């Protein structure tokens, strides 16, 4: 049919100028109205084509866009809301249109008018219309009614068979007209019926461009995959055929969204698995060869980024493939939230995917189910407004660049979040740095899959998970909004409670009695806290009375702690570390070494957020304290009486004689010890896990009864900003308070040290302070409970210890270590911890764990920095002495900082490696690996340093023909300079033999020399170095009773100044080398 052929191109209306479309439509309408003799089938065609044109209209005609700037409209909630609303009703208007278009069923204008009014009423009864829209309703409804009636009257009635069809058409269009007029935000309606008709039809195209399958959600979602159709269709090539529409390949029906198309294909069976053959045909629609090649190169990758299954994250090459996948797997039924889900498959093997879901999903609900209800309702709410599951792969589903930025800013806390510990970061660089420092990038998958398997799923929650797979956020602490997503997960249960605002706590109180009583009890104690301040000032920790108040039967505290310790030990010995308290040992030690900066840093982290927002105030505490741990995977034990504690102490330390005041502290220490090690959790039986999961409330109240009293003193002396923080911790959290037990600043110091001391006892190791390389946190742990098993050697003044006291413990009520068997004063312990960080750590096996975790070797721990230690090095071999005594000489770079002996050896080796040619020129040849190894062994220089030195010398010689000790190499008449005595030589062999006289041995003997001989030869140098390092600490520059001797020529001088002048003028030595070549002699 010629008519059909003419109209075919109109499907891609987005490519056709709007004016042409309108003109064509006007002609078509006039032809119809003029009563052309069309048979019924042709009139059907007219209707179908009109609707196709309408549906294919470009999106520029959207009613929203006419009111607002188009780009701005994309991101604006107003446009979202109105679009949503329009598509909320699209199903009904489409059904009406289809009914009225059916040529067999005769529809009457009166009926359609009634339908129009119904559509009005429905559209504007929606609560989400703004007041602006309501105003428009008054003006526009009148206009559109006149408009509609005008159309009715202008409809001619030709011969009977045609009249039915054309009336149907007109009825449909009038319904459309009024509907779109009312929803449009433009009050301009044209007077002439024909142009008005075109405008309305264009506007309706936008109105109907929404999907009815998502009508369940009136609120807009931030990250909506349904926005796919807003992508620029030219960018993705054949992904979108026609005017950015999803079309069925079989019947060419156009749909606005992929889901609609999928549903259609499923219902009609319009799909085949062997649909790849048609992909090649699509490319022919591209007009320019350049574009075609562009599409062939990039189109597929882009398509795969966009064509993702929203449920499982798999990519597809064409829409049809994706639709077939959706139909076969029924995944389109499982995406009710309009949220993109990250491809979990990329992060973990599919076998572990379920474990991850289990892990991140809620489990261990409150016995009364209160938290579950609250959480479910909140999560339902959040699913519409927040989407923490953002991965870089999802950005193609967003609307455009501007709104993506806006959404990213709004959700930055969830997007830039460490999946292991939940800490949020401001920039990607910070997150990357955090992952590298803590080793979390290694642990995300392994720990998740390990720990995920043992969690027990709540059935209600399981249903939720079926449709919303969660990303692998393993036992994390999330910022407030996302924490609601996994409300009852073990860590989550703590966090979600912490996060609740006071009102929510009150709600909980009113909830079912079992939970209510426990919570109320806690709340009362906390409220009393300030009044109790006077009497309880002496008891900042748990007392026997507190323990007696709430003995709740249950887990054997001894057994659980033994499990914890034994499994931690076995893990440490087997080299498969799994630290609960800190995700990696690096994390445990990443703190500034000095006390003062640490204290200010902690305060800024913890106190400031509480001013900023009460909701976020806890995140800092969590990140410092609990967060690295699946803290409450093994909650504090129930059984908490003094006899149990005595047995525990007896078993762990073999001592029973412990002061009464220590017991509460031990109780307090043991709980976090138990809490911080997931290792124990892994080795415990599943039934136990279930049991702990089912009684969080009990534990909460148990641990808090004493804790409330303990914290009462805290509130009094913490800075203002911290008070709300502390109160909230006390009210909401089951066991956070135990870990944050002394004062807000060092709240994250305690747990590891307790476990550390237990391990010391079990491993039979002597506890020594940690080495500087592992440094800061470990030292702080020692500070917080530094009862050491071996005598201490305080070398710093006690003043320093007092300073630390003042920073860390305002009440001077120190926590007591579990292994405390000899009661020593704290101050000496503190002094020891601070002053002698140079000996080996008691937990060297822990430092070994670092190697396993990150593959990085821990740096050398033997670099004495204080004078007192330097004497210890006397008996060691020369290399050690040199390494330790001259950190300055270990600097690579300017040669003046090198040990001159090392330079002589290197220069001699280099000169001996030069080969003389027949013409008398010298050719540089590289030092062999053997020689390098010998030099390295003798000097202690690393192979890298030696290679760099050689490379540098060669570079200088090639570039300028000379270097410090060798000139004119390129001319064939080289001059070798001796660094020590400034003498010059013409041949390499004489130069080498001269250097060997300085060294006292020949280069060939380098590898054979015994250490003792080297020591003798180098003792002068080491002594000089010692003098150099002691210089500033020693006596005044010129002692009256000494003379100075030049080592090179043995002349003596009355003052240092004279020797320096002599060295500079006679030997050409630089000032930095003076001390090395000067020996101080006692005057006789």
Swiss-Prot record:
Annotated GO biological process: anterior/posterior pattern specification; middle ear morphogenesis; regulation of gene expression; soft palate development
Subunit note: Interacts (via homeobox domain) with APBB1 (via PID domain 1).
DNA-binding region (UniProt annotation): 891-961
Gene that specifies this protein: Tshz1
Region of interest (Disordered), ranges: 49-108, 140-167, 269-298, 467-534, 653-728, 855-879
Source species: Mus musculus (Mouse)
Keyword Cell division applies: no
Top-level division of the source organism's lineage: Eukaryota
Family: Belongs to the teashirt C2H2-type zinc-finger protein family.
Phenotype reported upon loss of the gene: Normal Mendelian ratio at birth, but none of the mutant animals survive beyond P0. Newborn mutant mice exhibit a strong defect of the soft palate, vertebral malformations in the cervical and thoracic regions of the axial skeleton and malformations in the middle ear components.
Protein name per Swiss-Prot or TrEMBL: Teashirt homolog 1
Gene3D superfamilies: Classic Zinc Finger
A single Gene Ontology CC term: nucleus
